[in-house]
């Protein structure tokens, strides 16, 4: 069944300006550190994301080391985005972060250029 978000999803959520950027962020964001890895039930995570969006949450926080295993939360969110939220992509803010050890060796830590390019 195709997902259709709540028509009144923006009526109850409070939104605040982010500095002087003009960007509006919801008062509540959803971080995907827990409950979105390969060890978790995909459909449960999908339901959480969809319900959050129905309630006006437009900011989803990820990182390339979220899982377990590392990266699996981003993969799962990508599937949810593709199948459920793609028509609403312009309404979403998706953030990530850098600086964590991703792989052994001198280029896999602390946000090196090589590490950041591997994410893109």
Language-model features and meaning:
Residues 1-93, 117:
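N-terminal binding-site loop/beta-alpha segment at the start of enzyme catalytic domains
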Residues 95-103:
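Substrate-binding cleft and catalytic face of glycoside hydrolase catalytic domains
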Residues 103-120:
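Glycine/proline-rich, positively charged
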């Amino acid at each position: 069944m195709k997902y259709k978000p709540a028509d009144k999803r923006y009526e109850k959520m409070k939104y605040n300006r982010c500095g002087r950027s003009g960007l509006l962020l919801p008062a509540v964001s959803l971080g995907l550190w827990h409950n979105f890895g390969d060890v978790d039930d995909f459909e449960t995570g999908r339901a959480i994301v969809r319900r959050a969006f129905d309630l006006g949450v437009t900011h989803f926080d990820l990182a390339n080391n979220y899982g377990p295993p590392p990266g699996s939360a981003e993969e799962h969110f990508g599937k949810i985005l593709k199948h459920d939220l793609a028509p609403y992509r312009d309404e979403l803010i998706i953030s990530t972060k850098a600086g964590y050890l991703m792989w052994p060796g001198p280029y896999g830590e602390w946000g090196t250029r090589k590490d950041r390019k591997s994410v893109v």
